[in-house]
Amino acid sequence: FGDANSNVETYFEGTLANPSVTWEKERQLNVGFDATLFRKLDISFDFFNRDRRDILATPYRTIPDFVGFKKPEMNVGKVNNKGFELTARYADRINDFNYYVQGGVWYAHNEVKYNAEMLQQYSYMYRTGHRVDQPFGLQAIGFFKDQKDIDDSPQHTFMKVQPGDIKYKDMNNDGVINENDICAIGYTNLP
């Protein structure tokens, strides 16, 4: 029906523009002190707390999927970063020999406070409340020992399993390992 080499031009709605996009904002508190004791011991302590808001994120909760276009990025994300740094340095001299010893302790923690993410069936699937770079996936609980172990375990939908394969946790206890069992796993890549 028709010429096989004919072209049909089509147009479709891409991502909507968002003229209201702004720079993200940050409110921060930094407190610190430095002290020298006995002209030999230097101590430094710093504490920080940073609240970032208006971070660009896809607004899954405010624009439904059925609208038929890619959702624009909006300033809706919120993240908190806090931590401290403590360093100590001891310096002294013995005759003509000068020396010092220095050490430090650092701690930093970030948390997604709001991400406008898609509604989830189970609370453990949300990224909000976790660290920014928190990995998500299936939680490994061991290895399949034999065929009886496979038969007595929840059904895996991602692949056919055999003895020696990784066994995953059924997070929602429905007897099936699938995308509804994805949760926060492991540690983040950043300290």
Regions found by a protein language model. Give the residues of each.
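Extracellular/periplasmic, surface-exposed regions of secreted and cell-surface proteins
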Residues: 1-135
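Short, hydrophobic/aromatic alpha-helical segments in well-folded domains
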Residues: 17, 32, 185-186, 191
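Conserved small-residue
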Residues: 93-190
